[in-house]
């Protein structure tokens, strides 16, 4: 009996140690892809994916602003989500994303006048060493499409010769048409019939279209105007 108890104790201990080592390895692997500048979120996080069939599943995901692809972490490997036509929505850290062609836009307000943010970034060469310790930046912005192959190396840590410059593009969907804007003036041109009222609202509350919380207020106001 004592031998049996000792056997089960040793077996339980081995299982516990293997489990702990597995968790430590997983943590180390996810830590290695934390705080990478090309990603929208600091960490890969458990996300909810809804398919167009209504099926739900979970995946550890983040959004790569450089390639404009959803990246997911599976069995120690980073992969791109390529079958975007099957996706309805993805929820990451309580923020909702919908597919547009092969990329994803963040939903600011899903309404008759819908607002979205397209999160992007440029890959900037930091240059090569020049005379007297200076740096040459003549290379400038690099086309990612020329650099990314079937296995996307830009899901991982980038070379020190490059840096990421993030920016946003804003979209309005109205009457099933998408309209792009980058600033307040471009937004007002989309709503020519109501631009006076929108301008007053922006000035009254000192809103900035490049601040998400302000854009939510502005989106709600625009929907009230077009009821």
Give names to the regions the model predicted.
Residues 30-46:
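Short N-terminal segments immediately surrounding and downstream of signal-peptide cleavage
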Residues 188-227:
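Long, compositionally biased interface segments
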């Amino acid at each position: 009996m004592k031998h049996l108890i000792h056997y089960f104790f040793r077996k339980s201990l081995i299982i516990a140690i293997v489990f702990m080592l597995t968790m430590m390895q997983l943590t180390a692997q996810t830590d290695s892809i934390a705080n990478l500048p090309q990603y929208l979120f600091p960490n890969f996080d458990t996300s909810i994916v809804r398919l167009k069939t209504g099926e739900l599943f979970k995946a550890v995901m983040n959004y790569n602003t450089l390639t404009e692809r959803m990246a997911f972490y599976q069995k120690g490997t980073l992969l791109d989500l390529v079958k975007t036509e099957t996706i309805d929505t993805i929820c990451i850290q309580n923020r909702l994303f919908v597919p547009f062609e092969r990329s994803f836009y963040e939903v600011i307000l899903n309404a008759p006048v819908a607002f979205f943010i397209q999160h992007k970034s440029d890959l900037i060469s930091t240059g090569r060493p020049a005379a007297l310790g200076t740096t040459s930046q003549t290379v400038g912005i690099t086309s990612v499409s020329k650099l990314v192959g079937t296995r996307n190396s830009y899901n991982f840590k980038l070379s020190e010769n490059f840096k990421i410059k993030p920016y946003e593009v804003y979209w309005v969907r109205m009457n099933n048409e998408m309209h792009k804007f980058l600033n307040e003036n471009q937004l007002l041109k989309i709503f020519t019939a109501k631009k006076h009222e929108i301008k007053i609202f922006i000035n009254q509350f000192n809103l900035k279209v490049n601040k998400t919380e302000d854009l939510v207020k502005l989106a709600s106001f625009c929907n009230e105007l077009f009821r």
